[in-house]
Amino acid sequence: MSTAVSGNGNDPKPTALQDHQQPAPTTGTGKSTAAGAGADAAKNERGKGKTVAFFLAFAALIAVLLIPIPGLDYTGQIALAMLAFAVIMWVSEAVSYPVSAVMIVGLIAIMLTFAEDPDTGKAIGASKGLSIAMSGFSSSAVALVAAALALATAMQATGLHRRLALYVLKFAGEKVSHIVIGAIAISIILAFFVPSATARAGAVVPILLGMVAAFGLPTESRLSALLIITATQAVSIWNVGIKTAAAQNLVAVGFIEDQMGKSVSWGQWLLWAAPWSILMSIALYFVMRWAIKPETESITGGRELVEKQLAEMGPMTGAEKRLTAIAVALLAFWATEDILHPISSATITIVAVAIMLTPKIGVMDWKYAQEHINWGTLIVFAAGISLGKFLLDTGAATWLSEKTFGAIGLSSMPIIAAIALVSLFNILIHLGFASATSLASALIPVFIALASTLDVPNGGLGFVIIQQFVICFGFLLPVSAPQNMLAYGTGAFTSKQFLRTGIPLTIIGYLLILLLAATYWHWIGLV
């Protein structure tokens, strides 16, 4: 019987992507030295820019605190100041996201300690201030994210997601058109079982690069660009389709539960979002075939390479079989939430993780999980929820919504017009964010406040959900999403190639949002 994976010899190999990276060709020592000097200069410039942004964030914080804001008490002003600080930190990446998250929590706690409680007229105090700053850490959504990260780590520990990807590509064959469809299909299948966009991209990208290399083409070939961008964009598309596919969805669900008093089951999300993702997947195929013309329409030896890699993996291990059983059972429980049973997605996922960590019947031990789970993501997630709740509870989100959207008379517009304008704003502001989780933390509270002013069904639930779908748009630039950057790091495509596919995908995605809002989502009562 196969033993559970431990941290001693069966670690997933994070260098799989690096195996396909090739150094830039040089024609002489002089050019190589010049390139190195240029890279150092660019690095220094970025460092200076981050330093400026770091101090600018604190300057913005102080400025918002000092400027009188009519209609907002001082705690609301602190919330607004923290939002300004967070946005500058997140957009500039002056410090890493986890570091900025810790700073946000600490600053909220310190400022509230000395701030006056608008209800009592006394200082809020250290205990209550810290409780408000840490409120996001007690959200059930944080527990779900932690469990989802553990599930993604288990997939990497066993290599099950890679085996699944290889099986799909084996059936895709050697025609490029079929492999493109296969890359999309892999992203769809993995979205159901791997709750991490980066992990899904990390499973597929090395395999596709290996197929290109087997044909004798370099990493920077058009064929590489076609396949890698297809897989990456498909990951972003299905971040929308599946509730558990991306952390930013769980941010939105957490705010909806806490502030709107409504729960969104896994099945409900699928019913609402899957039609958009299915239509976008079809559009993705045609956009990619139009945007990038590969050097060849057939990869000779591609199937043999996939079969060889499957043979090297050997038969399914006991850990893989157990993880398959756990993942299928988990999916079944997710899909039947509030239909066959009342158990929440978070509870089910935590139980599944407990089973995965149990000796003999599990698939990994705690030491392995501790070393490989991205705990920074969890801290960013919880801090983002704390900030969002702070904005909503103090009325700062409502004030910001009124000032941002009230001036254009959004509340008096037809719902389709409101969705069109806010979605466009959402897409444009995403250009400044590399993390959709941070973007959701900043915008969803504002959208919840805005939804309360609109004449829409379900108290504006559908409006907020649709804006969360748009937050998942990461099609335009490599820096728009972590999975994009992972793929971009292989050197398989340029920013220009990515943008060439991203512009039509963003336009189509936006138009589909409006089409479904006017038809399908209206028919089922979402909007």
Regions found by a protein language model. Name each.
Residues 2-3, 20, 30-34, 38-67, ...:
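Juxtamembrane and boundary regions of transmembrane helices in multi-pass small-molecule transporters
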Residues 44-50, 66-76, 168-176, 217-221, ...:
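Short, amphipathic, aromatic/basic-enriched membrane-interface segments that mark the entry/exit
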Residues 52, 56-63, 81-88, 103, ...:
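Lipid-exposed faces of alpha-helical membrane segments in multi-pass integral membrane proteins
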Residues 53, 71-81, 138-150, 200-204, ...:
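Structural signature of hydrophobic alpha-helical transmembrane segments
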Residues 88-96, 186-196, 232-243, 335-338, ...:
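Transmembrane alpha-helix interface/packing and boundary motifs in multi-pass membrane proteins
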